[in-house]
A protein has these predicted regions:
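Beta-propeller domains
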Residues: 236-243, 252, 280-300, 305, ...
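Extracellular polysaccharide-degrading/modifying enzymes targeting complex plant/algal/animal polysaccharides
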Residues: 25-351, 356, 397-401, 626-628, ...
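Short glycine/acidic-rich loop motifs that flank beta-strands on beta-rich extracellular proteins
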Residues: 79-80, 321-327, 361-367, 385-391, ...
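The right-handed parallel beta-helix/beta-solenoid scaffold, focusing on the short coil/turn
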Residues: 24, 64-66, 73, 79, ...
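Predominantly extracellular beta-rich ligand-binding scaffolds that present long acidic/polar faces
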Residues: 79-86, 92, 96, 524-646
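Right-handed parallel beta-helix
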Residues: 308-319, 348-359, 371-386, 399-418, ...
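Extracellular beta-strand solenoid repeats
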Residues: 69, 76, 82, 96-98, ...
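Bacterial Sec-dependent N-terminal signal peptides
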Residues: 1-24
Length: 703
């Protein structure tokens, strides 16, 4: 009898967990109607209506799961889905938003634009009445499933800044002036396009600056009458990262820049202009313009009143926008203030599985304030205005239960981001702890792949015990920004582990294309079993920090140097042991590696060009006499095929001598079906384009 009761209990729990046979079901269809009851044969049309119906069902029966099942098709979202504490489920009766089995379900936050006509063979136009009559101006346009280029000058690349001068209007009490005007001096040939600007051009056009790790986006106030220069205004420039003669810029969104295939321009009277790409016709080209900036808002009240136990499964959210404020955007590392199309506050046990987020103006997801035990798994995030996933707040809270923790991002593809905010990050952890970022494929971004921590220096930081494992992070930077890392850390991070990651092809504009990068105050971090290659400045760099352990890694083929350190401090900065450093160009060490306080031993160094490896100005023997690397070796690890990036070690004698433990770096990245893994793979066209960026910049440097 006990056995029978146990079996029955197991069956009941199974069905409750699966949320299927015993669930209360609400159906959605593109052909539905929100006045329907939400049955399979009389479905609803929108998610807000389904949410409202779910609230009624929960009030009548809170013991059964509620499933909102979307049938095949495309759904136009006219407003975001907003969930609050009243929508919370329980562990055994969650609320589930999912696609019907086998269905392709797309929620679109934008409308299709029709009515194009030819102005001539190389220019089309359409009238968009919503822009003319309802102030529905948009700044992104998606054409046949790709992000089209807003008219810009130059069409590719950047113009140089020759000089920037600042006049402070109001100093304020902060680290930078509160109000200031900047005069940007440029080449006369680069300013000719904007000398005839109308008042409307000044209101609409955006000049975008790239300076080190930041971007500044501003309107042009006026042009100088005495020299090739223009004026912008807003906050004062950051003394630690101002616009200067090393900065670059381009300008977009004025009709005079509309001159290249694939570009578009929208004027304030409602006329949309587009130059078609080869092969595009009015009949075979579909245009979508965003009307929403976000898809989902999940908002609890407090740590004691969270939104909990909600699942999203196999849904696609696509086409969302971003409208630039009239004052533009001040620079911000990692595009930290920029929102996301899905935002959660005071949320627990919320999961996103098998979902797709694409064609956005901002980040993908943000687990912001007071979130815990949430997950994102097997999701595909691409064509992003900013980055992929944000965890935690930039504001430091005093109450522990206000701090986001235990968020899992596993087996996701995050690629092709930074289209509006190039300084955005693939996955970033601000003030948050105990998170796990595993098996993610992160690529084709203009800044860092993963970032953890948000305190500069040794002050208290709640960002601890974060796990970054088995991620494949590659093709970052693209020669556009500086000061980036495949994995980037900040502040006291005791218990944080960065291991088993495959990081390669990180290329900055000037300095700062690093694989593993422990920046200001990084403390208590273990980095082990990582393979890092083809990074511009070095495979590993520590700006400053203490008691970080860098062990059992392979650093190979990095371009300028292999190892780098900047600030020399009295305490021990790192322990560097059991690593293999293999290179064929550049130097072994750069900056102050030879000066700062480190324990370095049981490493293998090999320069394929010579057996005389130099440690800054020292020979190996001189280096050892200084107390470093006394048990290390200069030896060929005999990788299987390093030219094709096969770094399996064959020289087991060397491995044993330095206590190196081989690791399987092929396990990094996404897992599952061949189709899923293929989706995450970088196409050869992207690799070739990236290689051309590297070759072009390296050739310029040598000149």
């Amino acid at each position: 009898m006990k056995f029978q009761l146990s079996a029955i209990l197991i069956i009941i729990l199974f069905f409750l967990k699966s949320g299927s046979l015993l669930s209360q079901q609400i159906y959605l269809s593109p052909e539905g109607n929100d006045s329907n009851p939400g049955t399979m044969y009389q479905p609803l049309a929108t998610m807000p209506a389904a949410r409202d119906r779910a609230r009624i069902l929960r009030s009548e029966n809170s013991q059964q799961p509620v499933e909102i099942i979307a049938l095949e098709g495309e759904y136009l979202m006219l407003k975001p889905l907003e969930l609050d504490h009243s929508d919370a489920g329980t562990a055994v009766s969650p609320t589930i938003f999912r696609a019907a089995d086998g269905a392709k379900v797309i929620f679109r936050g934008g409308v299709e634009i029709n009515g194009f006509e030819k102005v001539n063979d190389n220019l089309w136009k359409a009238f968009v009445p919503q822009v003319a009559y309802y102030d529905s101006y948009f700044e992104q346009l998606y054409v046949n499933g790709r992000r089209a280029t807003r008219a810009r000058s130059p069409n590719d690349g950047f113009y140089p800044v020759r000089k920037a001068e600042e006049t402070i209007a109001e100093k304020g009490t902060g680290r930078m002036p509160q109000v200031a005007v900047q005069k940007i001096i440029v080449d006369s040939s680069d300013i000719k396009d904007i000398t005839g600007f109308t008042d409307q051009d000044h209101e609409d056009a955006l000049v975008i600056f790239y300076h080190n790790w930041d971007n500044t986006r501003k309107r042009i106030l006026s042009l100088s009458k005495s020299e090739p220069a223009f004026f912008i205004a807003g906050e004062g420039m950051k003394p630690w990262n101002p616009i200067n003669s090393k900065s670059r810029w381009f300008i977009e969104n004025f009709q005079g820049a509309l001159d290249a295939p694939g570009e578009w321009f929208l004027d304030r009277t409602g006329y949309l202009y587009y130059i078609p790409l080869p092969g595009e016709t009015i009949e075979n080209t579909i245009f979508h313009a965003p009307i929403l900036k976000e898809f989902i808002k999940i908002s609890g009240v407090s740590p004691g009143q969270t939104v909990s136990n909600i699942r999203f499964e196999n849904l696609t959210f696509t086409v969302a926008g971003y409208r630039t404020p009239s004052t533009g955007n001040e620079p911000a590392q990692a595009a930290a203030p920029v929102g996301a199309v899905i935002t959660l506050d005071y949320a627990s046990d919320i999961s996103f599985t098998g979902c797709e987020i694409a064609h956005t103006g901002t980040y993908g997801l943000w687990f912001r304030r007071g979130c815990n035990n949430c997950s994102v798994s097997k999701c595909y995030l691409h064509d992003l205005g900013a980055g992929g996933i944000k965890i935690g707040e930039t504001t430091l809270r005093n109450a522990v239960n206000e701090i986001t923790n235990n968020i899992i991002a596993d087996n996701n593809i995050i690629t092709d981001g930074g289209h509006i905010f190039p300084c955005a990050v693939g996955i970033i952890i601000f003030h948050a702890s105990d998170n796990r970022l595993t098996h993610n494929e992160i690529s084709n971004l203009r800044y860092s792949g993963i970032s953890a921590g948000w305190i500069w220096g040794y002050a208290h930081s709640p960002s601890k015990r974060n796990i970054v494992r088995f991620n494949h992070i590659h093709h970052l930077g693209w020669g556009e920004l500086c000061d980036m890392g495949g994995v980037y850390t900040l502040g006291a991070s005791e218990g944080t582990i960065v291991s088993d990651n495959l990081i390669h092809d990180v290329y900055s504009y000037d300095y700062g294309g690093w694989g593993l990068y422990t920046d200001e105050g990084s403390y208590g971090i273990v980095m082990e079993n990582n393979l890092v290659y083809n990074c511009k400045n070095s495979g590993f760099h520590q700006h400053y920090g203490k008691e970080n352990i860098i062990r059992n890694n392979i650093f190979a083929f990095n371009i300028r140097a292999q190892l780098q350190a900047t600030r020399v401090e009295e305490h021990r900065s790192i322990s560097f042991t059991n690593n293999i450093i293999y290179f064929d160009k550049g130097t072994l060490l750069t900056s102050n590696w030879h000066k700062f306080n480190l324990l370095s031993d049981y490493n293998c160094y090999w320069d394929t060009r010579t057996k005389e490896v130099r440690f800054a100005d020292n020979s190996f023997i001189e280096w050892q006499k200084s107390g470093k690397d006394t048990h290390s070796v200069i030896a060929d690890p005999m990788f299987t095929d390093p030219g094709n990036f096969n770094f399996n070690i064959k020289n087991l004698k060397v491995a044993k001598k330095i206590n190196f433990k081989p690791f399987d770096y092929t396990q990094a990245g996404v897992y599952g079906s061949d189709e899923w893994k293929k989706l995450g793979a970088t196409g050869r066209d992207i690799e070739v384009e990236f290689e051309s960026v590297v070759d072009r910049n390296e050739s310029r440097t040598k000149k």
